[in-house]
Curated annotation (Swiss-Prot):
The keyword Manganese applies. This is Riboflavin biosynthesis protein RibBA. The gene is ribBA. GO terms for molecular function: 3,4-dihydroxy-2-butanone-4-phosphate synthase activity; GTP binding; GTP cyclohydrolase II activity; magnesium ion binding; manganese ion binding; zinc ion binding. NCBIfam families: PRK00393.1, PRK09311.1, ribA, ribB. It comes from Bacillus subtilis (strain 168). The lineage of its organism: Bacteria, Bacillati, Bacillota, Bacilli, Bacillales. Its cofactor is Mg(2+); Mn(2+); Zn(2+).
Length: 398
């Protein structure tokens, strides 16, 4: 159904248009995408004719700053925070709307000799400013277009157009597949592009390592920072780094302040953390990776808001969704990079969560065995554990 990212990059380098599909839990739409440097009148006309949506030009922050392209509005209330700037035309265009003139304006954006006064405001080209960090920071078509351009070795700019059906509705994956076949286009997902970037780009930096005696034994603790969002993560390690080919006992644990520190009975996080450290110490070799992904990625305050909803009868999944979040926002790409830095290639993973296994394997790590980590249910977390089993697929038994 979808093509490898490498095939899409080859097509873009040849001046072809591709289709990029975003997450079904986001807009669930497809955009035509081309490199800005290959945005010929023919490409613009193709997008206008067969895409029918708004043609925009995603740009890196550097290009936007150089040309003094400011946000369209001071307070962005768009649900996806799409970063439109004021629309533009090149001053030498007439109406600015024809395929030829839109192509001319796009090419002028890439010209290093262009200055802000070369462009009229408003116009018929709609620049979008991509966030630094690209799809790893924001999983949108804007960032995907700029990431793809840079991966092609081209200037950080693209041209995109939402794809609509003939009846004016948004084209979803089944229709997009037919459109791709009809026009012989490569089609990729932003999800695959995110994975491609995690596998290709090192985004964590080892900052420090210390020896730490604990109630569970003496560990070597490695501190890391994430270059994209500045978050800090730590790995508690027993054994010699780098590890060899022999499977290593690993626990990837997401931060839970209420459970890990204060002994909350609403979850099983604290007991899981302690059990994992005990098992690693008993084996004398292993890694506990502590990721700062509080509340399955929604943050501490939002987790407390979710708890408030649970007091009103919501379960843990329903509470997240009521707050506008997915049930689980965690991403394991950064964790995989830290494990690779520690020389972990093959592991025995302490987890009840099959999605965690898939998440880590998707970044090139091998999991030879799943080691269950089920804790005894308590009065206040039994519903929580049953929901994780029934709705999130956790491998638990009651």
């Amino acid at each position: 159904m979808f093509h490898p990212i490498e095939e899409a990059l080859d097509a873009l380098k040849k001046g072809e248009v591709i289709i990029v599909v975003d997450d079904e839990d986001r807009e669930n739409e497809g955009d035509f995408v081309a490199l800005a440097e290959h945005a010929t009148p023919e490409v613009i006309n193709f997008m206008a004719t067969h895409g029918r949506g708004l043609i925009c030009t995603p740009l890196s922050e550097e290009i936007a700053d150089r040309l003094d392209l400011h946000p369209m509005v001071e307070h962005n209330t768009d649900s996806h925070h799409t970063a439109f700037t004021v629309s533009i035309d090149h001053r030498e265009t007439k109406t600015g709307i024809s395929a030829q003139e839109r192509s001319f304006t796009v090419q002028a954006l890439l010209d290093s000799k262009s200055v802000p006064s070369d462009f009229q405001r408003p116009g018929h080209i709609f620049p979008l400013i991509a966030k630094k960090g690209g799809v790893l920071k924001r999983a949108g078509h804007t960032e995907a277009a700029v990431d793809l351009a840079e991966a092609c070795g081209s200037p950080g700019a693209g041209v995109i157009c939402e794809i609509m059906n003939e009846d004016g509705t948004m084209a979803r994956v089944p229709e997009l597949i037919e459109i791709a076949k009809k026009h012989q286009l490569k089609m990729i997902t932003i999800k695959d592009l995110i994975q491609y970037r995690y596998n290709l780009t090192t985004l964590v930096e080892r900052e420090v390592d210390i020896t730490l005696p604990t109630d569970f034994g003496t560990f070597k603790v490695y501190g890391y920072t994430n270059e994209v969002d500045g978050k800090e993560h730590v790995a508690f390690v027993m054994g010699d780094v780098p590890f060899g080919e022999e499977p290593v006992l690993v626990r990837v644990h997401s931060e839970c302040l209420t459970g890990d520190v204060f002994g909350s009975h609403r979850c099983d996080c604290g007991p899981q953390l302690h059990a994992a450290l005990n098992q690693i110490a008993a084996e004398g070799r292993g890694v506990l990776l502590y990721l700062r992904q509080e509340g399955r990625g929604i943050g501490l305050i939002n987790k407390l808001k979710a708890y408030k909803l649970q007091e009103q009868g919501y379960d843990t999944v329903e509470a997240n969704e009521a707050l506008g979040f997915l049930p689980d926002l965690r991403n394991y790409g950064i964790g995989a990079q830290i494990l690779r830095d520690l020389g972990v290639r093959n592991m025995k993973l302490l987890t009840n969560n099959p999605r965690k296994i898939a998440g880590l394997e998707g970044y090139g790590l091998s999991i030879s065995e799943r080691v269950p980590l089920q804790m005894e249910a308590k009065e206040h977390n039994k519903k929580y554990l049953q929901t994780k089993m029934n709705k999130l697929g956790h491998l638990l038994h009651f």
